[in-house]
């Protein structure tokens, strides 16, 4: 079961095909198929460009295929862009997400460039919140390497401000986070 067993699931119509079994997720350059995930929650299927509200919060959906065939990012109140696995932030800027995990690297790079254009055409400069590598409010930093993939096999520029992750995490508390211990990247 779990904490969210009765929660309504908002998911892109294309992404939902992974949950129905119509499509199987392939990783490590398509050498390995992930097991099917089944979720029995009530679902609301979303489409590219769709805007809806939940409790007065505006949510806009942008289809950015590549990492998965139906990967979406969500713009909240024109201020916050939840990018999931679309962007990977290195110390020197944003890249298209990890190449070995993409359904199509070429499509991922193309989608990232299209996302940048959509935001620029509307003069939007949201806070970018990634699924794995933090956040930034620096638009140029977020798209610095939009035409490049984050490769798990190439040396990346180290981030001297990134916390070392092999330590006792007892100090990783809400108080420490609010005190400024955790900073956005590219600022």
Protein language model features and the residues they cover:
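Active-site HxH/HxHxD metal-binding segment of metal-dependent hydrolases
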Residues: 1-51, 147-148, 152-167
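Short, well-ordered coil/turn elements that cap or connect secondary structure elements
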Residues: 4-6, 54-56, 123
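Well-ordered beta-strand scaffold positions
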Residues: 14, 50, 57, 79-80
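Intrinsically disordered, low-complexity Ser/Thr/Pro-rich tracts
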Residues: 46-49, 56-57, 63
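Metallo-beta-lactamase
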Residues: 58-65, 69-153, 159-160
């Amino acid at each position: 079961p779990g904490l969210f067993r009765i929660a309504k699931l908002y998911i892109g119509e294309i992404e939902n095909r992974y949950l129905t079994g119509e499509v199987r997720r392939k990783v490590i350059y398509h050498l390995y198929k992930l097991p099917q995930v089944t979720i029995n929650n009530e679902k609301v299927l979303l489409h590219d460009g769709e805007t809806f509200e939940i409790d007065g919060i505006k949510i806009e959906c942008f289809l950015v295929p590549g990492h998965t065939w139906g990967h979406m990012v969500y713009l909240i109140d024109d201020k916050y862009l939840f990018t999931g696995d679309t962007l990977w932030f290195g110390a020197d800027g944003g890249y298209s997400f990890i190449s070995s995990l993409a359904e199509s690297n070429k499509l991922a790079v193309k989608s990232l460039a299209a996302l940048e254009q959509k935001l620029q055409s509307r003069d939007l400069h949201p806070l970018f919140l990634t699924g794995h590598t933090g956040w930034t409010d620096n638009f140029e930093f977020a798209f610095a390497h939009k035409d490049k993939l984050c490769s798990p096999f190439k040396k990346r520029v180290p981030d001297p401000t990134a916390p070392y992750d092999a330590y006792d995490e007892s100090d990783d508390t809400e108080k420490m986070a609010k005190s400024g211990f955790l900073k956005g990247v590219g600022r």
